[in-house]
């Protein structure tokens, strides 16, 4: 049903993580009553917690499961990847705190939240040591801190010497401008090309015009070399820290994967619950027989202010419901409402209907619904209509909900009515629950007499 796809897509917008969004978009109606009941209870539990506690602090992460798996295989995680791991660990902690922020009895979601292993120590270590995907804090280790102190001290010494040089009247006359810059990781001064021999040092670059050569004065060559040495040692120390953090991630990989999977499930439930709040939806009772009763049901895709609630019952007193009335009278909306709400519930969504509503679990939803405001009474429409009906008859069986809009339309009224009666009788013989709309008076009589 296209309507169900739209509802699922709308709910998926509430997912924080891309992986859980994809998981929700792939959801399909469940056919086991116990699974449907459990899924509804989980969504209802999270819905109640959202009302009590508000939304949890929960940031989007993506592909972190693969990062943990790579750590186990010996790959070294980058700073950005470690920050993603820390973000996931922070999510675990925030979800645990949110779940425990209000007292409640045992809930069907307990196992998901108890599966979360936050590892606050590791999360804090990573977050303190790594400031950004390309920036590690000086305090990440004592060695790194000492190396950076040496780098800064040496750089300051070089700048002081070069700035003194560019201010010196005897030297400045050879310079293109009085600035200190960096070329190839070395501090240099811009010397006029014609005076290159007047400033002793190593040429590292030439301007595009050839008018300027960038010279590393001999006085700072040794200091520049020390900086390069310190930079190499700095890179080695950063790599050592990354290897150490990666090892810690690898050590918790089994718990992390279990927690990550639970987090994605929770994200899906939060998205479902947010949709329920938005729709003012409730948990229906799941019946074990083949009958349902929707009380004050509203079409989930129509503005609640414009939607007229409707009561729909089927399967107890009668197995087929024929809806008649003029165009724009709401017949098609009623069909769609019944089908969508039953399918929503089987996907674990709360439904926009009174909490006294009851649903059953169908194995199939067989639908032929058009737009009652633009039905073309033509041979091509009738042919397409009959092709769909033929397909429905091939699949119809007990525990199936069949929804037919304008049954028999598109042909001679007398023939259409007779055909519609024959189709209804065959579907009833197959043991389906059937809802159909019609304009034919003959079907009204048939419904009353059957």
Predicted regions and their residues:
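Extended, Lys/Arg-enriched charged tracts that mediate electrostatic binding to polyanionic substrates
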Residues: 145-195
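Long, charged, glycine-rich C-terminal linkers/tails
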Residues: 166-183, 273-296
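Gly/Lys-enriched N-terminal cap/neck module of very large, oligomeric protein machines
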Residues: 7, 185, 189-205, 213, ...
């Amino acid at each position: 049903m296209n309507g169900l796809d739209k509802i699922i897509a709308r709910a998926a917008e509430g997912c924080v993580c891309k992986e859980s969004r994809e998981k929700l978009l792939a959801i399909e109606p469940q056919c086991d009553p116990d699974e449907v009941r459990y899924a509804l209870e989980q969504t209802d539990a999270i819905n109640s917690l959202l009302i009590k506690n508000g939304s949890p602090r929960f940031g989007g992460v993506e592909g972190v499961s693969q990062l943990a798996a790579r750590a186990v295989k010996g790959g070294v995680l980058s700073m950005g990847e470690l920050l993603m791991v820390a973000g996931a660990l922070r999510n675990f902690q925030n979800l645990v705190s949110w779940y425990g922020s209000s007292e409640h009895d045992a809930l069907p979601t307990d196992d998901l939240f108890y599966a979360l292993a936050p590892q606050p120590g590791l999360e804090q270590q990573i977050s303190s040591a790594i400031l950004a995907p390309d920036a590690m804090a000086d305090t990440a280790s004592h060695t790194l801190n000492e190396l950076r102190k040496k780098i800064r001290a040496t750089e300051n010494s070089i700048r002081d010497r070069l700035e003194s040089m560019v201010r010196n009247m005897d030297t400045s006359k050879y310079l293109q401008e009085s600035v200190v810059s960096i070329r190839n990781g070395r501090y240099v001064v811009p010397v006029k090309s014609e005076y290159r021999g007047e400033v002793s040092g190593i040429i590292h670059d030439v301007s595009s015009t050839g008018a300027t050569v960038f010279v590393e004065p001999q006085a700072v060559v040794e200091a520049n070399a020390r900086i390069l040495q310190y930079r190499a040692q700095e890179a080695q120390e950063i790599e050592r820290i990354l290897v150490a953090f990666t090892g810690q991630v690898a050590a918790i990989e089994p718990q992390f994967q279990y927690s990550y999977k639970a987090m994605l499930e929770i994200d899906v439930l939060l998205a479902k619950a947010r949709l329920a709040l938005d729709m003012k939806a409730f948990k229906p009772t799941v019946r074990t027989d083949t009958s349902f009763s929707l009380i004050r049901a509203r079409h989930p895709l129509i503005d609640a202010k414009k939607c007229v609630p409707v009561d729909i019952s089927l399967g107890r007193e009668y197995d087929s419901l024929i809806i008649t009335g003029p165009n724009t009278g709401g017949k098609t909306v009623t069909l769609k409402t019944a089908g969508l709400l039953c399918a929503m519930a089987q996907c674990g969504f709360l439904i926009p209907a009174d909490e006294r509503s009851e649903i059953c679990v169908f194995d199939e939803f067989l639908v032929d619904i058009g737009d009652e405001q633009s039905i073309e009474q033509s041979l091509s429409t009738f042919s397409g209509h009959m092709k769909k009906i033929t397909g429905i008859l091939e699949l119809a069986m007990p525990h199936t909900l069949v929804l037919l809009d304008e049954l028999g339309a598109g042909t001679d009224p007398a023939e259409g009515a007779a055909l519609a009666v024959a189709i209804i009788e065959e579907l009833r013989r197959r043991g389906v629950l059937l809802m159909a709309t019609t304009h034919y008076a003959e079907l009204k009589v048939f419904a009353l007499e059957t």
